[in-house]
């Protein structure tokens, strides 16, 4: 009986040493997984926001509630590509104050605003947010300086046309 008590005390000491050696690695793994999961979540939110912004930019012009057309701009106007992206990010629960939205044409004549694009012209919306604004653990184990997402679409702006005001007669 005495020997079992001595062995169990030695075993308890070995368990404590093993835990002291393994705990830092387990802690780093858990924190790394949490940070990687958050990074993946934010990346998915940015991808969705870029897609929503590209979808709006693809329209170029929209018909507002009064029946007149409204031009789609990147940074100004209502709605704008930037406001659509920021609203999508805010609805997901992230801060959107330092979000950067860029619009770039990939084909055809370069234009600076979505409403100036021609039908079928391909463009790219890039959304960037500083990772420090969205991470929940300030451990900075794997964290990049910023996260970026891109969405490519083609312009759906209608071809310009004129209406013949004189009707044909028989």
Question: Could you tell me what each predicted segment is?
Answer:
Residues 22-35:
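Alpha-helical transmembrane segments of integral membrane proteins
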Residues 35-44:
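Transmembrane signal-anchor/signal-peptide helices with a preference for the extracytoplasmic
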Residues 1-12:
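N-terminal leader/signal peptides at the extreme start of proteins
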Residues 2-3, 43, 48, 52-170:
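Short, conserved structural patches
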Residues 11-25:
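N-terminal signal-anchor/signal peptide hydrophobic helix marking the start
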Residues 17, 27-30, 42:
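Alpha-helical structural signal
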Residues 18, 35, 50:
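Conserved G/P- and acidic residue-centered "switch" motifs that form tight phosphate/ATP-binding loops
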């Amino acid at each position: 009986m005495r020997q079992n008590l001595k062995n169990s005390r030695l075993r308890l000491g070995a368990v404590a040493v093993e835990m002291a050696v393994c705990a830092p690695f387990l802690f780093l793994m858990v924190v790394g997984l949490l940070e990687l999961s958050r990074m993946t979540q934010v990346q998915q939110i940015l991808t969705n926001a870029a897609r929503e912004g590209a979808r709006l930019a693809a329209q170029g012009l929209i018909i507002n509630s009064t029946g007149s057309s409204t031009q789609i701009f990147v940074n100004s106007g209502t709605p704008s590509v930037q406001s659509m992206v920021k609203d999508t990010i805010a609805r997901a629960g992230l801060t959107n104050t330092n979000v950067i939205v860029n619009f770039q044409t990939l084909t055809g004549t370069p234009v600076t605003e979505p409403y100036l694009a021609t039908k079928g012209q391909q463009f790219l919306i890039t959304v960037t947010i500083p990772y420090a604004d969205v991470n929940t653990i300030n451990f900075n184990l794997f964290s990049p300086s910023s996260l970026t997402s891109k969405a490519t679409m083609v312009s759906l702006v209608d071809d310009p046309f004129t209406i013949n005001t004189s009707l044909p007669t028989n």
